[in-house]
């Protein structure tokens, strides 16, 4: 597909006024045949694949947004965890108050003022100058003096190789640190032992140096504002793990136990929140320096009172919805009764009455509460109606048995669901009806039963669909056409299995296809033409049957040719001669009388007569199966069959030395060229509707005028 053609097609499909139906109609009118439509289909498919690739690329580009979403989820999870932890601590604190002595409480009042905003564990840690970390590792807090902070940083710089230049930042201090084990994210294989150092604005990950006890090497440094922490649920033996997300990578670490893991999660979230609050305060202070002039006071704005009155007016009106009527108060219970008694129409009538009453009214809390109760009943009613249309229910009632449930679903505003369930129910019914047909007797008898059952069911379904969904969205009709195409595929599967897979004769197959076409044309009564679908589904099987029968004729003709003695036929009795004349007249050979005499002799070879009957029979049966997609297959098969007989006559004429037999062969050749071929050509044109140039060329290229007496080979 060229770039210009692709861009032109893309612009056409992306235009605001694009209409698919008009586009397909114009395309069908402008195309020369099936090949053009196939090429256009390939172009549309290529454009669809290109669009899919662009969509994948856009999804990958939006991966950062996914990371941000995961980060916010982890924030929420951590906050919920901390809230639960704080509530537990507050509960234990309140329970311990009655047990404390009043003098002790008075003595502790002076020291409790500075730590009143923190939990018990944080208050004790603040008094000691540090927060306890895992396994005795100190967790420094912002309350530690400048000297302690500097001392902690100095110790850190001495233990970690390669981080001195990275951590010399004013105001930076150590908050928490501890040993961790890193795991591979995909296969959960252990990678290495690391040590984590959490600062007030970043997280440092360092690897162990096995040959140097207590020393580490710098591995990675992550700013806290770009870091998301996710708790990993325990899945033994993998437990006590948490994940760090840093676009575009993630790392999984395992703590020594559940307590240390909890400490890591808490302190990471606390530090991230503190950093966020600090930067927000800095932004607010910076914004305050360039704040706009003060807003006009309330007393100097004469319009503010009027605006407040206007805003208050709807609120007052919202409270005036009257829900005290008895039928509204009892509506939820009445809906329950209707659903229990399977009074679907009554339930929907009540809902319509309520919607009509509340149509133009506001939605104060009382109305919202009523709506919530009613919506729950609507959900229950929908579930019951869906069950009524499920294929598991009895299918004996036919399409009309579904009308009640379908109509109520449409009234509830669920037309699409009603359409889907109705068609699914009818598909199950059609499948069951086809499966219950007994295969017995002749194939044609079974096909008559199959066509009657299937097309009658399809016609009833179409009429019921038109009744139920009249006036609804046109998309439902598109869904019905798709369903009919699928149902036709189910029918063709059963049809082909019995007709073509069982190797029936071509005449039987032709009669069966004729019966199916006649039934399919009955759907035209309701404006539904599925003939092209049945053609498309049967073309492969019919083509195979034609080619198979062609090979049978060719083999039979070659076998007769091998035994050819070039003698006149002797039918022995006048009755046999009369029967042959009748057969030739039915084949379209009207001048057969000139090749017969007063006695029972026929001045033609048995091989030529048998070939004529077999070829004309093949043509008649093939024309019953004909539709445009099979034109070239039928034409090429006819030409190939005729060439076998013509070449045999030409070869025999060259090789025969007896003058009397040579004259007889010429008479048979004249019968083939002057009688049989024109009949084949005329009958083909009558059945197809247009002449066949290949047959004309075959007849016009008379072999009798090009015979080389010295040649002993046939001209192909």
From Swiss-Prot:
Residues 275-284 have a biased composition (Basic and acidic residues). The modification Phosphoserine is found at residue 15. It holds the Pfam family VPS51_Exo84_N. This is Exocyst complex component 8. The keyword Transferase does not apply. Residues 173-273 form the PH domain. Residues 110-119 have a biased composition (Low complexity). Component of the exocyst complex involved in the docking of exocytic vesicles with fusion sites on the plasma membrane. The modification Phosphothreonine is found at residue 313. The exocyst complex is composed of EXOC1, EXOC2, EXOC3, EXOC4, EXOC5, EXOC6, EXOC7 and EXOC8. Interacts (via PH domain) with GTP-bound RALA and RALB. Interacts with SH3BP1; required for the localization of both SH3BP1 and the exocyst to the leading edge of migrating cells. GO terms for molecular function: phosphatidylinositol binding; small GTPase binding. Residues 110-149, 275-319 are annotated as: Disordered. PROSITE patterns: PH_DOMAIN (PS50003). Keywords: Cell projection, Cytoplasm, Exocytosis, Phosphoprotein, Protein transport, Transport. CDD domains: PH_RalBD_exo84. It is found in: Cytoplasm; Cytoplasm, Perinuclear region; Cell projection, Growth cone; Cell projection. It comes from Rattus norvegicus (Rat). GO terms for biological process: endosome organization; exocytosis; extracellular matrix disassembly; Golgi to plasma membrane transport; protein localization; protein transport. Changing residue 228 to W: Strongly reduces interaction with RALA. Belongs to the EXO84 family. The gene is Exoc8. Residues 303-319 have a biased composition (Acidic residues). InterPro entries: Cullin_repeat-like_dom_sf, Exo84, Exo84_C, Exo84_C_1, Exo84_C_2, PH-like_dom_sf, PH_domain. GO terms for cellular component: cell leading edge; exocyst; growth cone; late endosome; perinuclear region of cytoplasm.
């Amino acid at each position: 597909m060229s770039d210009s053609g692709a861009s032109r097609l893309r612009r056409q499909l992306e235009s605001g006024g694009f209409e698919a139906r008009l586009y397909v109609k114009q395309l069908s009118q402008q195309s020369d045949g099936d090949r053009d439509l196939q090429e256009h289909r390939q172009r549309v498919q290529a454009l669809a694949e290109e669009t899919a690739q662009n969509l994948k690329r856009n999804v990958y580009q939006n991966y950062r947004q996914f990371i941000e979403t995961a980060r916010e989820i982890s924030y929420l999870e951590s906050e919920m965890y901390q809230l639960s932890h704080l509530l537990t601590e507050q509960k234990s604190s309140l329970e311990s108050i009655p047990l404390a002595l009043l003098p002790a409480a008075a003595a502790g009042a002076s020291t409790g003022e500075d730590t009143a905003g923190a939990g018990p564990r944080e208050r004790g840690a603040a008094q000691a100058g540090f927060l306890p970390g895992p396994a005795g590792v100190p967790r420094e807090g912002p309350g530690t003096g400048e000297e302690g902070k500097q001392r902690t940083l100095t110790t850190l710089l001495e233990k970690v190789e390669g981080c001195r230049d990275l951590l010399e930042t004013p105001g930076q201090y150590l908050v928490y640190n501890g040993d961790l084990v890193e795991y591979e994210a995909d296969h959960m294989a252990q990678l290495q032992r690391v040590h984590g150092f959490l600062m007030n604005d970043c997280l440092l990950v360092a690897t162990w140096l096995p040959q140097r006890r207590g020393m580490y090497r710098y591995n990675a440094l992550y700013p806290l504002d770009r870091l998301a922490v996710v708790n990993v649920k325990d899945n033994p033996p993998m437990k006590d793990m948490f994940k760090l997300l840093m676009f575009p990578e993630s790392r999984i670490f395992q703590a020594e136990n559940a307590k240390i893991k909890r400490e890591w999660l808490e302190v990471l979230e606390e530090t991230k929140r503190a950093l966020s609050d600090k930067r927000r305060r800095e932004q607010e202070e910076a914004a305050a320096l360039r704040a706009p002039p003060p807003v006009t006071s309330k007393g100097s704005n004469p319009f503010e009172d009027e605006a407040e009155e206007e805003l208050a007016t709807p609120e007052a009106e919202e409270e005036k919805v009257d829900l005290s009527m008895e039928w509204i108060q009892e509506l939820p219970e009445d809906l329950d009764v209707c659903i229990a008694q399977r009074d679907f129409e009554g339930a929907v009538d009540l809902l319509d009455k309520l919607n009509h009453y509340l149509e133009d009214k506001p939605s104060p809390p009382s109305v919202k509460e009523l709506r919530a109760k009613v919506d729950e009943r609507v959900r229950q009613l929908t579930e019951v109606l869906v069950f009524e249309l499920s294929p598991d229910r009895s299918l004996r009632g036919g399409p009309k048995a579904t009308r009640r449930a379908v109509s109520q679903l449409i009234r509830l505003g669920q037309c699409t669901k009603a359409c889907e369930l109705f068609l699914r129910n009818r598909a199950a019914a059609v499948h069951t009806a086809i499966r219950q047909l007994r295969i017995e007797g002749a194939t044609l008898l079974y096909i008559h039963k199959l066509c009657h059952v299937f097309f009658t069911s399809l016609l009833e379904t179409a009429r019921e669909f038109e009744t139920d969904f009249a006036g609804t969205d046109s998309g439902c009709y598109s869904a019905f056409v798709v369903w009919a195409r699928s149902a036709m595929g189910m029918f063709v599967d059963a049809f082909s299995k019995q007709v073509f897979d069982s190797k029936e004769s071509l005449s039987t197959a032709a009669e069966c296809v004729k019966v199916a076409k006649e039934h399919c044309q009955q759907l035209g009564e309701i404006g539904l033409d599925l003939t092209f679908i049945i053609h498309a589904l049967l073309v492969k099987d019919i083509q195979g049957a034609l080619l198979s029968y062609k090979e049978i004729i060719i083999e039979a003709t070659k076998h007769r040719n091998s035994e050819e003695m070039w003698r006149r036929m002797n039918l022995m009795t006048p009755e046999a001669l009369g029967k042959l004349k009748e057969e030739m007249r039915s084949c379209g050979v009207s001048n057969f009388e000139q090749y017969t005499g007063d006695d029972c002799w026929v001045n033609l070879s048995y091989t030529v007569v048998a070939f004529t009957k077999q070829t004309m029979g093949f043509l008649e049966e093939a024309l019953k199966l004909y539709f445009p997609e099979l034109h070239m297959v039928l034409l090429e098969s006819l030409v190939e069959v005729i060439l076998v007989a013509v070449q045999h006559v030409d070869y025999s004429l060259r090789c025969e030395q007896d003058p009397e037999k040579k004259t007889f062969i010429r008479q048979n050749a004249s019968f083939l060229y002057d009688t049989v071929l024109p009949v084949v050509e005329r009958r083909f044109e009558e059945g197809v509707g247009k002449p066949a140039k290949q047959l004309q060329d075959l007849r016009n290229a008379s072999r009798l005028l090009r015979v080389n007496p010295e040649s002993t080979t046939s001209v192909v």
